[in-house]
Amino acid sequence: MKNSSIIIVIFSMVLFSCGGSGSSGGNGVVPKTSKSDVIAKLSNTNWEKECSPYNKLSSGDLTDSWNVKIKLSIDSSLKSTYRTEYFHPTDTECKSMMFNALDISKFDISGKVISEESIEANGLNETFIYNADNRDIPPNYTLIYIESEKLYFGQKSGLNLGETPETRHSSISLDNYFTKVVN
């Protein structure tokens, strides 16, 4: 019986010293972000990406990257509008726009995904509903991550090309992000 009392006392001390209830009320534990939290953070927001290289237009004789500025608006239904301004490859400060393009897509946020960099992101299924080139753009299966005033998207890595849910992008570059526009 004496051993039982000692065990109960030790257990009580350990439980008390750890905070007891497990709630996050001021004990430094940050609650995990839910899907609805991510949707709320994205709804009715505007984002922009500063001047950066873009090489998806490279072909044949033209191998240089264009430089682009991208403005992204996301409405309450998670319809996203990308307005991309293209600048000559030598215009690294994006001073004189050559042309622009408009793409509209629909975001569908899925569950938690841990990236290759151990970042807790959400899956993003993006379906394009309009683009300026009238191209048939396949759905994009990627990642989405919000940290403070920065918005990150997944990127291709190995066999994870984002073509199907099974080959969803699995990497996030913290050097490649959109900044929230505060009105």
What are these regions (language model features)?
Residues 14-42, 178-183:
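Bacterial Sec-dependent N-terminal signal peptides
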Residues 52-60, 81-163:
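Contiguous, well-ordered beta-strand patches that form the walls/edges
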Residues 166-167:
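Intrinsically disordered, proline/serine/glycine-rich low-complexity cytoplasmic regions
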